[in-house]
Amino acid sequence: MQSRGALPVIAVTGMAFEASIAAGKGRDGVEAVYAARADLLERALTAALDRGASGVISFGTAGGLGPDLEPGTLVIAEAVDGPFGRVECDPAWSERMAAALLASPLAAQTRRGVEAAVAAPLTGAADKAALHQSSGGALAVDMESHLAAAAAAARGLPFAVCRAVVDPAWRSLPKAAMAGLRDDGSTAVLPILRELARDPRQLGGLLRVAADAGAARKALTGARRVLGASGALFPR
């Protein structure tokens, strides 16, 4: 855990619930920023970094790319492969995070590898398979890690990634699953209901997504607890 008065780690997420998990109880030195729209996220991240930071971590959920990864798998990335090229994560920090998780009850669901990053949602199984191949075997994909990596590099700060898989590689997301996501990272129920009313056949897929999201949320909450308690959530 950070010493009193140390600069915070900035956790970069896309959604409000991820930010809430990342921030924890708000007393151990993690400040979370979030937004679903890239420019809003970059603005929030810049403001947080201007206040001072000891490191940047991309923290939240992800889509699965590895064909064997179940919902709730935790990915501690070695590098991010995205629109700005491949960026290496801080090796010492990432190794400490992985070691803490591998020494915990979350060991069986923890993996190391590459995290892919994209600028637009990747919801189809075929698209996920194509990205897995083109990225050289990336395990998971999100829409924030490349932004977090670039911001950390620009400030000379250590960077790490901890992501939990929601939708596995073989599962396509129904349109309703994304309908309620607002630009600021919050969610609204009414657009989801409208989409279901338009096409009720999406209900089964949406229920599967809800179950997958529950597994990811549980894993992410557990990872936050383990990493915070061990001190591995913070760079040295």
Locate each region found by the language model.
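N-terminal hydrophobic/helix-forming segments and targeting peptides
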Residues: 1-2
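Glycine-rich phosphate- or other oxyanion-binding loops that anchor nucleotides, phosphorylated ligands
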Residues: 5-236
